[in-house]
Amino acid sequence: MSTIVALATAPMNCAIHIIRVSGPKAFEIINKISTIKIKKETFKIWYTILKDDNQILDEVLINTFVAPKTFTGEDLVEINCHGGIVVANLIIKTLIKYGCQPAQRGEFSRRALLNKKMDLSKIEAINNLVNAKNELSVKGVIGALLGRVSQSIAEFRHELFMIIGQIEVNIDYPEYDDVEQVDAIILKQRLLSLDKKITKIIDQSKKFLPINKGIRVLIIGKPNVGKSTLLNALCNEQKAIVTDIPGTTRDVIESSINIDNITLNILDTAGIHLTNDFVENLGINKAKALIDKVDLILYLIPANEQQDLELYDLIKKQKHLLVYTKKDLVDQYDDKQIYINAKNNDIQSLIDEIKKLFYVQEFDNANIDVLQSQRQIGILENVHYLINNAILNLEKGDTLDLIVADLEFCNLRLNELLGISSEYDFLDDLFKNFCIGK
């Protein structure tokens, strides 16, 4: 295995940079440029000056970590140098000169996975923590980072192992009287109980995913209903030109904001109506094409007008809110509807409805143990499907080997979630609890 090096901090001028070196020759290589002997001792901080021949590179602090008790599971050295990017690059260039290889993207985390320092769920959580868009996203990542999500998946696997093991024993040793026979009713109950737990984490994860990645919001309506005014109010700055002339917005304007601990990725669009203007029609077609590609649609209607049923037909199957703008135009309000005056920044009622629609309060007041990506959710949904297929086959009276085939594939998918080997000897685990051939 090669010894790798990379800048662990952002590639820009700052107060301090951290350069990470990992691999079997980490200490050997660092000692080629250190003016003092960096001993192979763990959890130590060393002050030294780095030199290449007679050229002084920098005055640094070096943190040392000895395998296997490191992030990567390998010998690990972290150099804390001054924050000039030129200085950091010079040190990295020198380390490469003396034997380091430039690290590939994510290679330190990959080595941590290969050396079983953490599972794939935790690895993905680290990346999500770095890219967290708001405090609620951080809260959702922490559950995975601390291993609570991995523990849940491990419990699913263990229960699955026990079920598969019992079935395998019945298939392979039918002649033994002391082997507990598979009871179809009990087996179905165990599978239903397992599926209930899996469904719960799928449902929670689906709810949380838009919050984690940012809620994609499409603002639509007829021309001059206040779409761009709402965008500017949400962003608290003029992102879009606002005039009294219908059709001012002709293209999609996108902006990302954090507001009340949620991230909104907002798309302001051209007003949807019949027009002979070629350019405006392009913008209208873009708006229509986005309808099924967002998490939420805000359909804006002036408070003194009725909704356009033809336009509503385009969005009614998607998650949406009807928002009545220019509330100052009416004297009475329907308590069941949302009224705003974006020109005066009177939009809190809309923000509150968005938070309610995406369960923000629910997540804000509880520990969040959720999957971190659509990929992970998709895998667990496949497990849910396979378990239900096994239950269906059980109810039809199919043979045990057909039922166990679905469950064994469930095991492969759960292993995929954790990034571990899919090889597992079920009988070895089961022999601890079964008395075979005594």
From Swiss-Prot:
InterPro entries reported for this sequence: G_TrmE, GTP-bd, GTP-bd_TrmE_N, GTPase_MnmE, MnmE_dom2, MnmE_helical, P-loop_NTPase, Small_GTP-bd
EC number: 3.6.-.-
Alphabetical keyword list: Cytoplasm, GTP-binding, Hydrolase, Magnesium, Metal-binding, Nucleotide-binding, Potassium, tRNA processing
Amino-acid positions noted as binding Mg(2+) in the UniProt annotation, renumbered to this chain: 228, 249
Chain positions recorded as K(+) binding sites: 224, 243, 245, 248
Entry note: cofactor: Binds 1 potassium ion per subunit.
Protein's GO biological process: tRNA methylation; tRNA wobble uridine modification
Cellular component GO terms, alphabetical: cytosol
Locations listed in the record: Cytoplasm
Enzyme class: hydrolase
Role summary: Exhibits a very high intrinsic GTPase hydrolysis rate. Involved in the addition of a carboxymethylaminomethyl (cmnm) group at the wobble position (U34) of certain tRNAs, forming tRNA-cmnm(5)s(2)U34.
Family affiliation: Belongs to the TRAFAC class TrmE-Era-EngA-EngB-Septin-like GTPase superfamily. TrmE GTPase family.
PANTHER family with a match to the protein in the record: TRNA MODIFICATION GTPASE GTPBP3, TRNA MODIFICATION GTPASE GTPBP3, MITOCHONDRIAL
Subunit structure: Homodimer. Heterotetramer of two MnmE and two MnmG subunits.
Protein name: tRNA modification GTPase MnmE
Organism this protein belongs to: Ureaplasma parvum serovar 3 (strain ATCC 700970)
Species classification: Bacteria, Bacillati, Mycoplasmatota, Mycoplasmoidales, Mycoplasmoidaceae
